[in-house]
């Protein structure tokens, strides 16, 4: 009996050792008999993730090329050496090029958007806002919609003077002038914006223009287009669902408003040549916002195609309505048009061209007024979309300045006392332009930081010219000079103040190094003056 118990005990210990051994074996990595099912979803997700990330490399390996399906120019592949010098921006440029051109980019963008749209009801692109009822909005318009980062009072004062200078310059030449702002889509259809975007309770751009713009050249499009949108409601929209622009119905409405205003000064304007009320609807429009979300197969929507009572022709071959310069001619009108415009006028060209004998449409910046010499211009229209209004403060129009002959202003300036100063400004540009000779200068920080109007006098000739309160962004070499000589930080260069002035070749001849000049500056409705000498010219 004792022996039996001992043997039983021995067998029990052996069994225990065997079980422990099995347990140790089963807990060692790679030796489990079965893969746990609870880890299967993670494995599938990880595999798909790495497969998707590998698609661009796999596509490149087999020679697949990605087609540009977006409505923009993609970044070009950079070179390591440019102009026999190392390209120090190569890595940054390469990143931009690869981001724009990697294989399967359109398909991956579309997939990402669909995932976000279906799971979270948001856009898959930081540039697109998904609104109500499948409406899409351009994210670059959010500041305008929310009334954030609006133009300051000083910027509005400068803008008012910029528009006034162009209006007066054209009036002296017998040319009518219309300045108008194409509304952002969410300014016309705010009811389709997401609920979480709440505009501030401050004046919008229309109210700001009405309050502060001195020139009567401004034409309000916001109010009548908003009224039209509200009256038609869902029967006929005037902006695209999936595009940031108005559709042809909205463009026709804008054209009617513009031409009614123009006919006040041009009574024989054949407005009847505008398209009639008959139209055809085709579901063939690919909106720019839809292309951003799905470049490979963007959603299409309805476009309204209107008939026309007249014809026109292009004076030169046109690739698309996005061309920088487009010229048309018609045998119907007797007036000539110059229009500085952006992409919102793409749809206006078909509507305005039959109304004018000659029409020139320019998308170039800065606006070049030497184009009026190409035809006997009767009307200049400046159209710019609401979201880009700030560009008018960055690019001074190219137009030869006239000497000031306003006796009231000359008398007012003659009473302003001035003091001598030096090293208060530096010329950053001294080049020939289509208008003659362009000079541009930056004021040293702390001098005339709130300048609204700037007038330059050359004592040697007694002539006075009003300059634009605009400085274009300095190039790299000038920026280095400013940071070195004046100790200005790079981050503040874009906020500097100054002026730009276009002079005739004859007037520019007296602008020499150390030439004495007097600068009159209006700040807070008060004139100041300083005598100085041209430096850095």
Kindly give the residue locations of the regions a language model identified:
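Extracellular glycan-modifying ectodomains
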Residues: 2-537
């Amino acid at each position: 009996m004792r022996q039996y118990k001992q043997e039983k005990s021995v067998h029990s210990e052996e069994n225990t050792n065997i079980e422990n051994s099995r347990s140790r074996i089963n807990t060692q990595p790679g030796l489990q008999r079965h893969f746990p099912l609870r880890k299967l979803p993670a494995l599938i997700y990880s595999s798909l993730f790495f497969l998707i990330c590998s698609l661009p490399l796999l596509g490149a390996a087999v020679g697949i090329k990605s087609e540009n399906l977006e409505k923009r120019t993609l970044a070009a592949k950079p070179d390591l050496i440019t102009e026999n010098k190392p390209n120090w921006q190569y890595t940054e440029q390469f990143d931009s090029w690869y981001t724009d051109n990697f294989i399967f980019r359109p398909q991956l963008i579309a997939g990402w958007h669909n995932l976000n749209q279906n799971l979270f009801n948001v856009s898959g692109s930081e540039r697109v806002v998904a609104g109500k009822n499948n409406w899409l909005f351009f994210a670059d318009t959010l500041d305008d919609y929310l009334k954030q980062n609006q133009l300051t009072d000083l910027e509005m004062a400068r803008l008012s003077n910029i528009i006034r200078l162009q209006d007066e310059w054209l009036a002296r030449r017998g040319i009518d002038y219309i300045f108008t702002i194409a509304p952002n889509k969410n300014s016309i259809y705010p009811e389709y914006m997401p609920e979480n975007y709440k505009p501030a309770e401050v004046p919008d751009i229309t109210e700001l223009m009405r309050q502060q713009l001195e020139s009567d050249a401004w034409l309000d499009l916001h109010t009548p287009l908003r009224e039209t949108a509200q009256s038609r409601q869902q029967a006929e929209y005037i902006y695209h669902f999936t595009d940031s622009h108005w559709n042809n119905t909205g463009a026709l409405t804008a054209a009617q408003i513009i031409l009614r205003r123009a006919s006040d000064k041009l009574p024989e304007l054949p407005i009847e040549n505008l398209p009639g009320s008959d139209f055809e609807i085709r579901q063939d429009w690919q909106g720019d916002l839809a292309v951003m979300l799905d470049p490979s197969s963007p959603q299409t929507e309805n476009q309204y195609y209107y008939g026309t009572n007249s014809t026109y022709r292009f004076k030169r071959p046109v690739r698309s309505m996005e061309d920088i310069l487009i010229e048309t001619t018609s045998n119907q009108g007797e007036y000539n048009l110059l229009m500085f415009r952006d992409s919102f006028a793409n749809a206006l060209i078909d509507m305005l061209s039959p109304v004018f004998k000659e029409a020139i449409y320019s998308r170039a910046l800065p606006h070049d007024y030497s184009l009026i010499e190409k035809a006997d211009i009767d009307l200049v229209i400046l159209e710019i979309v609401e979201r880009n209004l700030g560009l008018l403060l960055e690019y001074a129009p190219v137009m030869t300045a006239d000497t000031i002959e306003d006796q009231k202003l000359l008398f007012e300036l003659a009473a302003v006392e001035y003091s001598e100063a030096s090293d208060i400004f530096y010329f950053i540009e001294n080049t020939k332009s289509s208008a003659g000779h362009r000079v541009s200068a930056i004021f040293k920080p702390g001098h005339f930081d709130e300048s609204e109007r700037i007038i330059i006098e050359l004592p040697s000739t007694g002539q006075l010219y009003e300059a634009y309160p605009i400085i274009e962004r300095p190039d790299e070499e000038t920026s280095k000079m400013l940071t070195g000589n004046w100790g200005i930080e790079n981050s503040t260069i874009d906020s500097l103040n100054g002026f730009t002035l276009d002079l005739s070749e004859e007037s520019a001849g007296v602008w020499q190094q150390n030439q004495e000049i007097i600068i009159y500056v209006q700040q807070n409705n008060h004139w100041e003056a300083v005598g100085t000498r041209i430096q850095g010219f």
